[in-house]
């Protein structure tokens, strides 16, 4: 029996579906430029740049003002609240700069994590209060999609059933609110790479978490064709003594997704989870070469793995703008190829792109 309660109209569904498909068009992924002020401070510290608003604006201006060819491999950019209202050097609001290239504008809407009592330092994510009003305003201000990150971890007994259920429910509630306000929700249940667990343990946890997430999305009547998933790849823990090949990581990842993610989801945009730039690209490429049916687009939603070499090239100096943009475009193009399984590593990746970007208990 169909329910007679308020739900999305056919027009709303079509708009959401069209937005999601634009973001993950063939060869395209997402630039996650939604790092908080504190996280940007840590990045700037590494290159001895002061964490002030003008420097943050300056770096993001360099990324966003890259020539229009960037739109061939970047379909969407996730903004931080501050960035949404900043302007480029020539006086245009950043969302306008990005939209003129044909790139979809997104916004991070969660308010960070809070501890779950009675668990082993597990968390839920805050920010549901007032979310509908914020989403309505963001839609008016040019956003067409949103992102919300939940964090889970693998250790003895973790993730707890409570943490899985709570985070799945929070993600579903967020997704429902976004869709009612015309925003495509990116659903991000990240399992942190902290720990010494092996590939199989991560695959098992990933399957349990994703199964719970899609059950919750169904319970909340979320329109799956108008959503995107941003999961972790299935990788061994950062301290795992055993090494696994990109093909093993890819097979475990695709197997977990095939068991849990409905085919109606248009795209799965992986987070990089502290992998080096090159590693994140190689793994994405291998995932798109797995000899199994993959009904969704499998692409990237990278922050560190798209920006690390660019930051190193910039060093806070205006004179380095062209070099920074060149490094950024090169990395974005590599990931665009990887999202089609067409990246052929030359074996001569520079040192910056091979450096691990791992941070324990990573806070975005």
Curated annotation (Swiss-Prot):
GO MF terms held by the record: fructose-bisphosphate aldolase activity
Q: Which domain of life is it from?
A: Eukaryota
Binding positions for substrate?
A: 56, 147
UniProt pathway: Carbohydrate degradation; glycolysis; D-glyceraldehyde 3-phosphate and glycerone phosphate from D-glucose: step 4/4
- A Gene Ontology CC term for this entry? centriolar satellite
Which PROSITE patterns does the annotation name? ALDOLASE_CLASS_I
Assigned EC number: 4.1.2.13
Question: Catalyzes what?
Answer: beta-D-fructose 1,6-bisphosphate = D-glyceraldehyde 3-phosphate + dihydroxyacetone phosphate
Signal peptide residues on this chain, from the entry's feature table: none
Active site as annotated = 188, 230
Where does it reside?
Cytoplasm, Cytoskeleton, Microtubule organizing center, Centrosome, Centriolar satellite
Keywords, sorted A to Z = Cytoplasm, Cytoskeleton, Glycolysis, Lyase, Schiff base
Q: Give any single GO term for biological process.
A: glycolytic process
- Where do the coiled-coil regions begin and end? none
Name the enzyme's class. lyase
InterPro entries linked: Aldolase_I_AS (IPR029768), Aldolase_TIM (IPR013785), FBA_I (IPR000741)
Relate the assembly described in the record.
Homotetramer.
The family this protein is said to belong to: Belongs to the class I fructose-bisphosphate aldolase family.
Q: Any idea what this protein is called?
A: Fructose-bisphosphate aldolase B
Which species is listed as the source? Sparus aurata (Gilthead sea bream)
Question: Could you read off the lineage of the organism from its UniProt record?
Answer: Eukaryota, Metazoa, Chordata, Craniata, Vertebrata
């Amino acid at each position: 029996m169909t329910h007679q309660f308020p739900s999305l109209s056919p027009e709303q569904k079509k708009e959401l579906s069209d937005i999601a498909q634009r973001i993950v068009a063939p060869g395209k992924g997402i630039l996650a430029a939604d790092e908080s002020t504190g996280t940007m401070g840590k990045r700037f510290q590494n290159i001895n740049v002061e964490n002030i608003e003008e420097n943050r604006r300056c770096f993001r201006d360099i990324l966003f003002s890259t020539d229009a060819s960037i739109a061939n491999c970047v379909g969407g950019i996730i903004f931080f609240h501050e960035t949404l209202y900043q302007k480029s050097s020539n006086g245009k609001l950043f969302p306008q700069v990005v939209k003129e290239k044909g790139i979809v504008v997104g916004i991070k809407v969660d308010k960070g994590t809070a501890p779950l009592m009675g668990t082993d330092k597990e968390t839920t994510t805050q920010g549901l209060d007032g979310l509908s009003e914020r989403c309505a305003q963001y839609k008016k201000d040019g956003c067409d999609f949103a992102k919300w990150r939940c964090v889970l971890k693998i250790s003895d007994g973790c993730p707890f059933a409570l943490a899985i259920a709570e985070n799945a429910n929070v993600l579903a509630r967020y997704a429902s609110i976004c869709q009612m306000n015309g925003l495509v929700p990116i659903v991000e249940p990240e399992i942190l790479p902290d720990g010494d667990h092996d590939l199989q343990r991560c695959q098992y946890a990933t399957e349990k978490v994703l199964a719970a997430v899609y059950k919750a999305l169904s319970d909340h009547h979320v329109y799956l064709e108008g959503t995107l998933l941003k999961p972790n790849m299935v990788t061994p823990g950062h301290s795992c003594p055993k090494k696994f090949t990109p093909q093993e990581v890819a097979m475990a990842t695709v197997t977990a997704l095939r068991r849990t993610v409905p085919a109606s989801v248009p795209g799965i945009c992986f987070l990089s989870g502290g992998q080096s730039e090159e590693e994140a690209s190689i793994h994405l490429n291998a995932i798109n070469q797995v000899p199994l049916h993959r009904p969704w687009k499998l692409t990237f939603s990278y922050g560190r793995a798209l920006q690390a070499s660019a930051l190193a090239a910039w060093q806070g100096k205006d004179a380095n703008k062209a070099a920074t943009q060149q490094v950024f475009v090169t990395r974005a193009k590599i990931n665009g190829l990887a999202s089609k399984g067409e990246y052929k590593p030359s074996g001569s990746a520079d040192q910056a792109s091979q450096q691990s970007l791992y941070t324990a208990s990573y806070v975005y």
